[in-house]
A protein has these predicted regions:
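Active-site-proximal loop->helix
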Residues: 175-188
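Internal catalytic-core helix/loop-beta-alpha segment
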Residues: 96-144
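A charged, well-structured terminal subsegment
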Residues: 191-201
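Active-site acidic carboxylates
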Residues: 1-109, 113
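A short glycine-rich beta-strand->turn/loop micro-motif centered on a GG-aromatic cluster
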Residues: 141-144, 162-177
């Protein structure tokens, strides 16, 4: 890995991205289905959820804008797409399906945005970017699942919309350690600041 780091550095990747206020928090898809190893979960996701409880408490204490995302398909699958074709089980995530509900310990409060999405990114086809912009957010802390999937997609889009993404490394999780580690490395090189919760706060 040291050789890879040197290669990236020589080519100009991995430049430090300094967080600047105001801050916001995005929690990506921490729903029951991704907390359950029998459905879409496993790996280090339970620990990431527990760490996000503390991160969310701090965000609320500081008065930061907080947004959550859920995957929600129409009851009749009228909005079924290539994402659902690639991962058919996701089509079971409906508005009232328990698997699509945000885990109780991170339940949204009044004034927090809940984005319903059918694509990996929490930004694609949603009001999230406008909502964050209206609240003046410059640095967006990101937690959620999975690191290699919807978290990464949301981080890339956050950067593309002009926000500074800060991936809180112990508050994101994946069902397998390899993809988790590889995507944290890659996001740190190209798209985001990446650091654990204690350092981020």
């Amino acid at each position: 890995m040291e050789q890879e780091i040197q290669t990236y550095a020589r080519q100009g990747f991995g430049t430090a991205l300094q967080p600047v206020a105001p801050y916001g928090l995005l929690i990506v898809d921490f729903v029951n289905g991704f907390a359950d190893p029998a459905q879409f979960g496993g790996g280090n996701i339970p620990g990431a959820i527990a760490n996000t409880e503390r991160l969310l408490a701090t965000a609320r204490e500081q008065g930061w804008p907080v947004a959550h995302s859920r995957i929600v398909f129409a009851d009749d699958n009228a909005d079924a797409n290539v994402f659902g074709l690639k991962v058919p089980g996701l089509l079971a995530l409906k508005e009232d399906a328990p698997a699509s509900a945000i885990v109780p310990q991170l339940a949204p409060r009044a004034g927090e945005l809940v984005v319903r999405k059918t694509e990996p990114s929490a930004f694609f086809g949603t009001q999230l970017a406008a909502w964050l912009t209206q609240r003046g957010v410059r640095t967006l802390l990101v937690a959620g699942a999975t690191t290699s999937g919807c978290v990464r997609a949301s981080v890339v889009d956050a950067m593309s919309h002009g926000f500074r993404p800060l991936v809180v490394s112990d508050c994101v999780g994946d069902r397998a350690q390899g993809p988790h580690d590889a995507n944290l490395f890659d996001m740190a090189q190209k798209y985001a600041a990446v650091m654990p919760r204690e350092q981020a706060l």
